[in-house]
Design a protein with these regions (language model features):
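C-terminal (or distal) subdomains of carbohydrate-active enzymes
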Residues: 131-134, 156-158, 183-193, 217, ...
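Metal- or metallocofactor-binding catalytic centers and their adjacent structured scaffolds
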Residues: 246-364, 383, 415, 707-716
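Alpha-amylase-like alpha-glycosidases and glucanotransferases acting on alpha-linked glucans and related
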Residues: 158-205, 209
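C-terminal domain-boundary segment and adjacent tail
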Residues: 8, 46-55, 60, 136, ...
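Alpha-helical scaffold elements lining the catalytic groove of polysaccharide deacetylases
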Residues: 89-107, 176-195, 560
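N-terminal catalytic cores of secreted or lumenal carbohydrate-active enzymes
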Residues: 1-99, 108-110, 137-140, 252-256, ...
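Surface-exposed loop and adjacent secondary-structure segments within mature catalytic domains
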Residues: 67-74, 95, 128-180
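CE4/NodB-like, metal-dependent polysaccharide N-deacetylase domain
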Residues: 97-130, 134-137, 190-204
Length: 800
């Protein structure tokens, strides 16, 4: 007869319908209760995940922490999960999942002498297809989840092998019924026993008061001891999975979806902040490693770890899913603010450290101040004013750089004159100081390059021409009208009715990458709650942004900008369409003044074919276009069109269109409740975002473009000095075209660099790279995540 393993637990949401301070209290009280029950019920065992909870207890109550350590040693307290908490399992990037394991498993090993063997995300709203490999390379062979249910996923398997694209497998258990069986629902244990007998396989039943903590109570344990159900055993997940060894199990490949499709896009603030913080921390790590290599400056490990923990905490599924109360997002904002402050400080320290050691004098004497010298830039008659442009990306990058200066000439590191463009700045400091300069920089992989500005002393505001709001340039290599913009690579046309792109022609490929006019539209989602429970679609179309106003903002040798403003109901949409010289994509900067309740803003692109490729953690997934709302990462592609975004995670496909979800006017934490005067609506007011439209070639290229969109080049205005560094440097080189590098950081155990990448095209091949002067030769299996030290030694995601 099949056994039922009784798993004592307490599902604890540190944030949901309460703030984290209350969550802290519930964790403390629940852990105390579990320890007390162990004294009263010798057979009772307790299972708990989430490294952040243990860290709170360690800091707040060392005596309780010592008790937990002893119970872990006895085998009565089981540590599962191996992550900082139970995150949303669709939205975080691959590196976030890697840091969940890195920071948590090492903590468990240090404090308890064990690591989690079982992944544990019982309440997360879906699970991306890359998780089996991530789990395996984080030291976990098993996985416990509950959502989606058998009915939601349309699959009957509850115990199975879950396999990712590279072939990695974990044993997975889908919790039947509930993760928090309490005294009033003990009959469910009998039902689970019947199901286990019917399927002839052992199963688990999870008992204990949950959501707001609590765990197994005296009453519950007393009643469980009186159950007349045979073959029950007090257990922990590791014990259960050990009993499955050698058994034949079905194999499920791909993602585990769908539950609560509205969570891919609810609360735009938390989604955008997550992407911004992830991108900045990854850039800070790369810049810090560059500075360490070039200047010897110390790598800020502890500060970056603190910042990563902030990001990981905010990835908790009820926070990141957008379904918590409004004050919870104020708290999330505080963590994001601290994270961005740390990231920006460390980026600045790294860049200043490098810039200060570059030989900007080039053998010339130090300049002396002369009357008429530019008032807020260092200036040298022969050398101009140096600008050091930095690239954190591990590939050569060409992007525009915006300077708060107006020179008359610019040169690159070789002294070659380069084009630049005077544009209107964002300041109005009198008539003299309201302009900026834009130029297109080319910087090597994880490198820098010095550019120089030269000023004409007699230049004044009267020499700048401004006609009809358009800043005139000396040359005009880009063609732009109100309804069309063009460079040597693409031509972009606008629809006079919708005020949106209606054609993008790829000159190099000789193809159109759109099949008609794009649209900005509203969906009526009155029937949805915040989660969009039991809804495949967010709603039906109920409004369209039209009556466009066209305005050419910029034309010049570097870029052209057309601003198009449209309205719908009470909302206004302002979009700047930007085409740069040398770019094969059109960048769109959006400012939406959104005042819609129970409505969703979507941007629709007519390019969908039978499938859509979407970025997921450390990889991609190809989905059939079935119409429903789906999760995505930093880019999606269907047919010839690719769309990169800077913080949007949901899309759908319908009637030949891919529709990116931008904003949702849902009620905070509304589970089909009363919608009255007390209801507070999310995403109201002004929101900004960006997206990039371009021709799709392959996943490796798409990853690069998305990373560049989310973190552009940085620059430092420099002075004059000698130094050991040249005016151009690159710290990375890679010959392989089918990998995406996601991280370059300092190893956890030593002083070596660590580089991580994943294979993008589903084909094995050689990988040759050079990192900080050290050559690395290895191979990448299809869809493999690989972590290497600079000497070529392979380690897992825990760097073991």
């Amino acid at each position: 007869m099949a056994k039922v393993h009784l798993i004592g637990n307490a599902h604890i949401d540190p944030v949901w319908l309460w703030r984290w301070q209350e969550g802290f209290s519930e964790i403390r009280a629940t852990f105390r209760s579990a320890l007390d029950r162990m004294k009263e019920f010798p057979e009772f065992k307790f299972t708990s995940a989430c490294a952040s909870y243990y860290q709170w207890i360690e800091k707040m109550d060392p005596e309780m922490f010592a008790e937990i350590k002893e119970r872990v040693k006895q085998g009565r307290w089981s540590i599962v999960g191996g992550w900082f908490l139970q995150p949303d399992c669709n939205i975080p990037c691959g590196e976030s999942f890697a840091r969940h394991g890195l920071l948590s498993q090492r903590y468990f090993q240090e404090k308890f002498g064990v690591t989690a063997k079982t992944g544990y995300n019982v309440d997360s709203f879906g699970h991306n297809a890359g998780l089996p490999q991530i789990l395996k390379k984080s030291g976990m062979d098993n996985y416990v989840f509950m959502r989606p249910s058998v009915e939601e996923q349309g699959r009957e398997e509850e115990v199975f092998y879950w396999e990712s694209a590279d072939g990695s497998r974990v044993k997975a258990y889908r919790i039947p019924e509930l993760y928090n069986i309490d005294a009033g629902r003990l009959s469910l244990i009998g039902e689970i026993k019947s199901r286990a007998d019917q399927k002839d396989i052992d199963m688990m039943a999870f008992y204990g008061v949950g959501n707001h903590g609590g765990g197994p109570t005296i009453r519950l344990l007393d009643q469980m001891g009186k159950l007349k159900v045979p073959d029950l055993v007090y257990s922990v997940p590791d014990q259960y999975f050990a009993g499955l060894e050698g058994k034949e199990l079905p194999v499920l490949k791909g993602e585990l979806q769908h539950h609560a499709r509205g969570c891919y896009s609810a609360c735009s603030f938390v989604k955008t902040s997550n992407r911004k913080c992830e991108s900045h921390l990854l850039a800070a790590e790369k810049f810090a490693m560059m500075a360490r290599h070039l200047t010897g400056i110390r790598y800020p490990k502890k500060k970056l770890e603190k910042a990563w923990k902030n990001v990981l905490f905010n990835q908790f599924h009820d926070i990141m899913g957008g379904c918590s109360i409004r004050p919870a997002y104020e708290d999330a904002g505080y963590l994001y603010g601290e994270t961005m402050s740390i990231a920006e400080q460390e980026i600045n320290y790294a860049l200043q450290s490098i810039a200060s050691r570059i030989d900007t004098l080039q053998g010339e004497a130090l300049p002396s101040y002369k009357e008429g010298t530019h008032w807020h830039s260092w200036e040298h008659e022969a050398l101009g004013t140096p600008v050091v442009v930095f690239n954190p990306h591990p590939w050569e990058t060409q992007m525009s750089v915006n300077l708060n200066e107006v020179p008359v000439k610019m040169t690159d590191w070789e002294g070659k004159e380069i084009p630049f463009q005077i544009i209107r700045g964002d300041q109005t400091n009198g008539n003299q100081d309201k302009y900026h300069t834009l130029f297109r920089a080319e910087v090597g992989a994880m490198g820098y390059a010095v550019y120089r500005m030269f000023f004409r002393k007699e230049a004044g505001a009267e020499e700048r021409k401004e006609e009809s709001g358009v800043l005139a340039a000396e040359t005009n290599r880009l063609s732009v009208t109100e309804h069309q913009m063009e460079n040597d690579l693409i031509r972009v046309e606008f629809d006079s009715v919708t005020g949106d792109v209606c054609r993008i022609y790829d000159k190099k490929a000789g193809r159109d990458i759109l099949r008609g006019a794009c649209r900005a539209l509203l969906l009526d989602e009155t029937r949805c709650d915040t989660w969009a429970h039991n809804q495949e679609y967010l709603g039906k179309e109920c409004g369209y942004f039209t009556v466009p106003e066209f305005q050419i903002l910029e034309r010049g040798p570097v870029r052209a900008v057309v601003r198009i403003t449209t309205t719908c109901h009470a909302s206004t949409l302002q979009r700047d369409f930007i085409l740069e010289e040398g770019s094969s994509g059109v960048l769109v900067k959006v400012k939406a003044d959104f005042h819609e309740k129970h409505k969703t803003l979507k941007f629709a692109f007519p390019a969908a074919e039978k499938t859509t490729t979407a970025a997921i953690a450390f990889g991609t997934i190809v989905r059939e276009n079935l119409g429903g709302e789906e999760p995505c990462g930093a880019w999606i592609a269907s047919g010839p069109l690719a769309i990169a975004n800077d913080g949007k995670y949901g899309y759908d496909t319908t009637e030949g269109e891919v529709r990116l979800t931008i904003l949702r006017g849902a009620v905070y934490a509304d589970h089909y409740g009363d919608r009255d005067l007390y209801s507070e609506y999310m995403d109201q007011g002004v929101h900004e975002c960006s997206y990039l439209l371009y021709g799709y070639t392959d996943a490796a290229d798409a990853e690069k473009r998305a990373q560049e969109l989310n973190f552009p080049l940085r620059h430092v205005m420099e002075s004059f000095h000698g130094g050991a560094l040249e005016e151009k440097e690159s710290c990375f080189f890679c010959e392989s075209d089918h990998i995406a590098v996601t991280a370059v950081k300092l190893s956890e155990d030593g002083e070596e660099a660590v580089v991580r990448f994943f294979e993008t095209e589903g084909r094995s091949g050689k990988v040759t790279m050079e990192l900080f002067g050290k050559r690395i030769e290895t191979t990448a299996a299809h869809n493999e995540i690989k972590t290497l030290k600079a000497d070529g030694t392979e380690v897992n995601l825990l760097e073991w």
